[in-house]
Amino acid sequence: MKLDYKSFELENELSTIDEMLVNCSANTDFQPLVPYNLRDGVMLSNKAAVVCLKLIYNHPNLSSETVKAYRIIDKVIYDAFRDNNNCTDVLHIGDYYVGIFYAPQTIDIDSVLDTMGILNAAVDILDIKFKNTMPISLSCVMAADFGEIMHSMDLAPYEGWQGAPINNAIALCNEVYSKCNDYYGATLITESIKINLKEEFASFFHAEWSSTDCPIKSYIEYVMNKVMHNWIKQNKA
């Protein structure tokens, strides 16, 4: 499978969120994936960046309104990943979204950071929209790593992704999340991401994260898309 590319347009997303808040039923479906031939059982070795986003929910109960919120979150998060043409797949398990990015060149790593900025802002926008209509608050933490990764199709029709970058990104997200709300909205990148970023982006990550769970060097900052951040500042109560 490969993500069907779609440009992330803020005004379109805002309109879609508003429409789904009014009209979306709990069983509304969408399909962001299209069949794609990955050619063989091993792919993207040493050529993949991985982004893990862990959503943080606060809602009183699992009502029909909560289910509606989940559907809207799914739509917007997938749209943010789809904005990057290098995004090969997204794994959604529980509160985790894990994006796999084909990134053989430095400029592709830069685009992964752009996607993280969109994702972070998208979650804040959803939080604002939900607070106006339902008792749900939303935040996230994110982490990214780069390195050897393997896509396995040997057990077709079952597929899977394996590799240290996936484990590292998830572990870093969990560690930051365990610090309660001190770091909500934080973006972590590993050393292997930082050294492949252009200087303008790399210099932004100067605060090193002291990890106790993940034995790799990483850095923490708060990354957000500028246009979307301006909307958030204007609309946040």
What residue ranges belong to the model's regions?
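A short linear-motif detector with a strong N-terminal bias
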Residues: 28-32, 68-71, 76-79, 119-124, ...
